[in-house]
Amino acid sequence: MDPEAFAVVGLRTMGGLEELFEAYGIRYLTASRIAEMGFTANTLLDMKEEELDDMMNSLSHIFRWDLLVGERYGIKAAIRAERRRLLEADDRRHHLHSTDHALLDALSHQGLSEEQVVQHSEKDQLGRAGSGDTAGTSWGAQQQRKKHRHRHHITAMKGAATEEDEEDEEEVEEMRRQREHPFIVTEPGEVARGKKNGLDYLFHLYDQCRDFLLQVQSLAKERGEKCPTKVTNQVFRYAKKAGASYINKPKMRHYVHCYALHCLDEHASNALRKSFKERGENVGAWRQACYHPLVTIAGRRAGWDIDAIFNAHPRLCIWYVPTKLRQLCHAHRHSSASAASSASTSTSAPTAHHLELPY
């Protein structure tokens, strides 16, 4: 293909990224990598700060792309500038629209006011000829009322705009609360496309947490402080200060049992991922399905003592056992003990009856 034609095709498939990053020192190859991941300029503009960090970390860790420090800041700066430009353009359009409506409203009120002035002037001249009231006085009063109505109209428009902004903010906040973590079910080695990340990336976050824990332990030893042995709030705060704001306590605690299955039985974990991917299940259903294999492993290896299994594993010993997983193991232990007790009772009862029989 001709180089110029190739460049034209490249521009068409960039999704507006080259224009977005043009003045911010982002390499063309970096922009093309981001486009290969399925992102466009509009997609990036709609993403939150944490999601942008996730995207850049996926680019670095999963795609093994050497993302420069300046490019990280340049991407965010370009997005902020474009958002600001779009917002200013919307404000200008809104201002012109409001001004036109206010002008038309004022003209309509002015026409009505003039008619009322003529009517009042005629009545004053007929009914109050000697009272000293003049048409000029009536005109001044009407002008005052007209100004008052105009001010009231402008105030009402501003109030309506403020209420709409507040409702929009409430809707955005509600969407943020309802929004689940940005993961989709992927097979091992599969790279997720779009705004959501795959499960390989999720498991990689747990390895990153382990690295942050080691750094916190090293700093604590240098300062003579108590070293944490598990991933605690101190580790999450350290990760946030280090720039890894995409690592947070709710997200990591939510999927820790899925990571445990990945560590204890990678073959079973991969089979489960493949099955749910083929059926088109979402990540919430896959997360729930990860409990049962773990309970089975706990019953087979340690008599349902899931804490012992976590503590004996080098990658799991730094994580707290989820309460639900512990409760499930306890329930299975109890039901198994009850079943064994019932079986023992039913087996021993006929023997006792046989001994009572006379010979």
Curated annotation (Swiss-Prot):
Keywords: Activator, Developmental protein, DNA-binding, Nucleus, Transcription, Transcription regulation. Residues 340-352 have a biased composition (Low complexity). It comes from the Eukaryota. The record marks 226, 233, 237, 284 as: Interaction with DNA. InterPro entries: FLO/LFY_C, FLO_LFY, Floricaula/leafy_C_sf, LFY_SAM. It holds the Pfam family C_LFY_FLO. Probable transcription factor. Belongs to the FLO/LFY family. This is Leafy/floricaula homolog FL1. It comes from Eucalyptus globulus (Tasmanian blue gum).
